[in-house]
Amino acid sequence: MSKALYIAEKPSVAQEFAKALKINGQRRDGYLESQDSVVTWCVGHLVTMSYPEKYDIKYKRWSLDTLPFLPREFKYEVIPGVQKQFEIVKGLLNREDVDTIYVCTDSGREGEYIYRLVAQMAGGHGKKEKRVWIDSQTEEEIMRGIREAKDLSAYDNLSASAYLRAKEDYLMGINFSRVLTLRYGNSVSNYLNTKYQAISVGRVMTCVLGMVVRREREIRAFVKTPFYRVLSSIALEGENFEGEWRAVEGSRYFQTPYLYKENGFKEKAYAEKLIQELLVSQPLQCTVEKIERKKENRNPPLLFNLAELQNVCSKLFKISPDETLKIVQELYEKKLVTYPRTDARVLSTAAAKEIYKNISGLRNYEHTAEIAQHIIEQGNYKNLAKTRYVNDKQITDHYAIVPTGQGLNALRSVSLTAQRVYETIVRRFVCIFYPPAVYQKISLVTKIQNESFFSSFKVLLDEGYLKVATNSFAKRKAADAMSSVNRAGVAGNEGSEEEDPDTGKNGGNKADDSAEDMACDTRLLAALQNLKKGDILSVDSLSIKEGETSPPKRYNSGSMILAMENAGQLIEDEELRAQIKSCGIGTSATRAEILKKLCNIKYLALNKKTQVITPTLLGEMIFDVVNCSIRQLLNPELTASWEKGLNYVAEGSITEQEYMDKLEHFVRLRTRQVEDSNIQPYLRQFFDAAAVNYKDSSEKNSAKTTGRSTSAAGRSRTCRKPSASK
């Protein structure tokens, strides 16, 4: 009797397939078997690319004579620690009574690669191969995936992109790490007084290092600029509110060189002068020049993809992206949430049609039981497909991370943090079935003489989705916030994580901006509603508020993941930015691991309490070496464009050979440029400039510095190179 063979990526996933298939047969060594089915598993990767010395022993010794290393055919080998399981899977693949193979590895590029390597190494089994593609591990979804499984050949382009990604990382890592180590490793080790220093380089890893080092140097080079704002205290029916002066057209200071932006002065004396000029008119009064009232909606945020979830968990729980991925992977394997390694923040049309089941299951989840019941009773889910939360065009492999509504008993077996991560996912999900929060926005312009003062108020009228957004473990904080809302009538950020993608640009200078929306109690709100143009109000006082510009913020582990996801926005070339606008560096499956590796090899340091990321001295030195030799590796343009190329291969837009030709040309050209270069004479000055910032750190060891100032160390430095390396 012919049997079907199901190959999962992990033993735990294989168990779920066995349950769904009702396999009650014997458990054997490395697989489960019934009368008509066999279920086995990999343990992640069973096969890997061989080291260069497996091609020829001469490659074991690092030498410029053997670079660039560009094999015509790539060699692979079984990973020694999993040899036994590989032999089991190989034997099952070639069993005579197996006629159909169901590939059940993770539904994505890496899962595809895991199986293809095993099949390649196992030899010609000549069976029918079907690909199971699922979004969760619920029994219903597993059976749907098996019923709708396509021929494996439908995923050949995805497989090609997976092989190319591995070859790309392999060739860049081996060639660039070896050539840079051979040329400049001694410069680094001699400076640090260490015995030997390999220079580790990677397509994505080095780009991330560049982002962190550049940000740190921007912070060091930043010089705070003081500025002085002029504020009016305006009386209205026994209440007071502020107006902020701005040098708009008609002001005596309009476009003068004394200004810092339009709402402040560079020097305090000019702010004092303005006040004296305005105080000439007594009694001090202002006229309502303009008043605007409008309602403003704040929509529920988009659903979680992995990057957004990692960012939020970094803020809420102070855990690293790697920890978040482990937690959400565990929740996925326990059937609690959908597939975690996704870049999408929306649902598919097909998923939206079945979303009732997810909501219905959440009626059994204590924290959202009433919410889920309300959504079902009101039928809020019925028009979901027409909202911005459903968009098939924004989905590649998988839709957003949402709760399945199943497996709730498994919550007892996970950590407290995992339980809270789950609730965070659930809250984000149920929010999309609620209306927007509604605010009353009041904008007011008053004039004293010809000088304009601006006031802005934002009042919460209807909580909308905010009423269900607050996590239960944050109740006290939320209650305090809501109490404040009820007293002041002003909306806070009650329980809602706003989308805050750090694109890596110099943001965060709140002090530079105009005054934020002001608090407004019930009496003041009523008075403002009655105001009209031409009304004259009393001004109690004029004052000066001093501020200063803020440096860029350091990345934390969450904002770093978002910066990697949004790295396309960092590209200055408008045409290139448009081409790869949605393509970041790395993938949702690899970003956390890359960040972890940079910390493990001591190029970056992660503060576990704050999750703030900073470079180490070694990391800055490696940055300087790469910046002077293969600068392209530090730039998002290169990394994101390679990633876009892999997507083109997966889509069938370009061929595997076209991509490979470009890759080999790049590796060959850059390797030879480094071989021909000589930047040692310039590296010392860069190392010195970085080291001065670590003079109190054990990192520096006994390395000598030039004693340059911190600001000098932070200044942009140009690496001059001999013509041979151009």
Protein language model features and the residues they cover:
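Intrinsically disordered, low-complexity regulatory segments
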Residues: 1-178, 265, 474, 495, ...
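C-terminal or mid-to-C-terminal helical accessory/interaction module adjacent to the motor/catalytic core
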Residues: 74, 87, 96, 137-234, ...
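Metal- or metallocofactor-binding catalytic centers and their adjacent structured scaffolds
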Residues: 255-302, 310
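C-terminal accessory/connector segments of nucleic-acid motor ATPases
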Residues: 222-245, 284-321, 327, 336
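Conserved short loop/turn motifs at secondary-structure junctions
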Residues: 2-3, 104-107, 196-198, 293-302, ...
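Basic, low-complexity terminal or inter-domain segments flanking catalytic cores
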Residues: 2-5, 28, 82, 93, ...
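Short active-site loop/helix that positions an aromatic residue
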Residues: 14-22, 116-117, 209-219, 427
